[in-house]
Amino acid sequence: MSEPVNKVKQTQQQVDDVTNTMHIAVGKMLDNQQKVSELTDKSENMKQGAQQFKKKTNEIKRLMWCRNIKLTLIIIAVVVLLLVVIIVPIVLKFT
C-alpha cells in the first residue's frame, strides 16, 4: 500500500515541478513582452527622429546650395566687372 502512496506523491511532485517551471516560463515571457514593447517604442521614436533629421538636412542642403549659387554669381559678376574695367579703357584708348 505504501507503493501507490509514493507514486501519488511522486506524481504530485512532478506536477508541482512542472507547475513551477511553467510559472517561471510565463514570468519570463511576460518580461520579454515588456522588453519588446519598450524596444518597439524606442524604435518608433528613433524612426521619427530620423525622419526629422532627414527633413532638416534636406532644408540645410537646399539653403547651402542657394548660398553657393549666390556666391558663385557674385564672384562671376566681380570678375566680369573687373574685366570690363580693365578692357574698356584699353579698347577706348586704341580706337
Curated annotation (Swiss-Prot):
Gene3D superfamilies: 1.20.5.110. GO terms for cellular component: plasma membrane; SNARE complex; transport vesicle membrane. Residues 7-67 form the v-SNARE coiled-coil homology domain. Residues 92-95 are vesicular. Its main location: membrane. Belongs to the synaptobrevin family. Involved in the targeting and/or fusion of transport vesicles to their target membrane. This is Synaptobrevin-A. It comes from Dictyostelium discoideum (Social amoeba).
